[in-house]
Amino acid sequence: MELMINSHPDLEGVLTRRTAAKLKVLSKGYYVKGTSQMNNAALVCAVTDALKEPDRLSELLLVVDPQTYTLFRRASESPDPIKVKDPGSEQYRLLDDFCYLVCADTPDGLVVSVPTQIRAAFEQLKNDGFLKQKDRFDLLHNYAMAAIHLYGAI
């Protein structure tokens, strides 16, 4: 869990608190080249650049479950960190592991926030029509699941 200094942390600040091993795992997941020769500062810059790509965020948000997407969207659009209703759930953990969300323990419970650079990437996606694309993708997914359940019952 990260300490929340302000309502929306800086992505580089979040990444600098990660270990070199975790940064290397993230960089491999984001297809960053030449990480074996990079020091921590270079890894932070490379992973930050990879995370700021709107297409990468779009790919992830299209395939996450509806509850996780709703949590991300609420946290992204909220001016303040939002409280996680069920801290035992897995909704926030995937996005926290990928550094798209920042979690913090507060006296009121677990809160999540979206780093400013990720918020900017999500805003760009929304301006480019991502919300309509997400709605169509979810509709197709629901039709496919309904067909699977229908044919499974026959």
Ranges and model annotations:
Residues 1-154:
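Type-3 copper protein
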